[in-house]
């Protein structure tokens, strides 16, 4: 369990950082509030009118989106942490689990990282408009300086959470790409070995059949694979020698069993000779013959 934790420690720490940073940005945005006073010039009034307003995240739709995105990222990071800790304590070989779980983690991490990046970009734009203003938007930070200062901290935390989420997504994509590469390499290697084996079998099976006809009941050294050319250090050749021997043995047995044996041959039985008793029953006695030939009195 400790070895698995050491291997996945970076991923766990990044998920933990993304969760805490996004949660902190969410709490700061939701709890941030300030009451401000500003003057309004009314036509016909000699003095401006003071108005009171409360700044919070519900006044701007962009802040609502920012708070919702930070909540989603924090919840997703907590869910992934729970799954990772459960796999560690259960002794699973990998935090990502199988291929399906790896794909789900990859898609979820990419979605969370892009959502966090979009929320951070929206918050940065709102902070710039609040500080600098626009032709149709006044700089509200002159009236709500404390609110803008605290919101700037939330923007920084959002960008840090985005960085952690992007690193998590990159690690997930690396694991997924590594698994896919290993699977493709294994398939390619298996295809190459099968092709070599098929070519060798086409050349070796006739020799085995011929030798099986000549030496049905004698054991001989298995033939070397044709592609080895006498090299005994080839790993593939060494692994295939036992396969050639087993193949020769099975083919020899098949050839031996295919030939009809004396027991299996159907020999017609010899013609039956009548016994002495049967002969006596068939041949009439002399007295009976005489009685049959004597005329009636």
From Swiss-Prot:
<dbReference type="GO" id="GO:0005886">
    <property type="term" value="C:plasma membrane"/>
</dbReference>
<dbReference type="InterPro" id="IPR006702">
    <property type="entry name" value="CASP_dom"/>
</dbReference>
<protein>
    <recommendedName>
        <fullName>CASP-like protein 2U8</fullName>
    </recommendedName>
</protein>
<feature type="transmembrane region" description="Helical">
    <location>
        <begin position="102"/>
        <end position="122"/>
    </location>
</feature>
<keyword id="KW-1133">Transmembrane helix</keyword>
<comment type="subunit">
    <text>Homodimer and heterodimers.</text>
</comment>
<keyword id="KW-0812">Transmembrane</keyword>
<keyword id="KW-0472">Membrane</keyword>
<feature type="topological domain" description="Cytoplasmic">
    <location>
        <begin position="1"/>
        <end position="10"/>
    </location>
</feature>
<feature type="topological domain" description="Extracellular">
    <location>
        <begin position="123"/>
        <end position="148"/>
    </location>
</feature>
<dbReference type="Pfam" id="PF04535">
    <property type="entry name" value="CASP_dom"/>
</dbReference>
<feature type="transmembrane region" description="Helical">
    <location>
        <begin position="11"/>
        <end position="31"/>
    </location>
</feature>
<feature type="transmembrane region" description="Helical">
    <location>
        <begin position="65"/>
        <end position="85"/>
    </location>
</feature>
<feature type="topological domain" description="Extracellular">
    <location>
        <begin position="32"/>
        <end position="64"/>
    </location>
</feature>
<keyword id="KW-1003">Cell membrane</keyword>
<dbReference type="InterPro" id="IPR006459">
    <property type="entry name" value="CASP/CASPL"/>
</dbReference>
<feature type="transmembrane region" description="Helical">
    <location>
        <begin position="149"/>
        <end position="169"/>
    </location>
</feature>
<feature type="topological domain" description="Cytoplasmic">
    <location>
        <begin position="86"/>
        <end position="101"/>
    </location>
</feature>
<comment type="similarity">
    <text>Belongs to the Casparian strip membrane proteins (CASP) family.</text>
</comment>
<feature type="topological domain" description="Cytoplasmic">
    <location>
        <begin position="170"/>
        <end position="297"/>
    </location>
</feature>
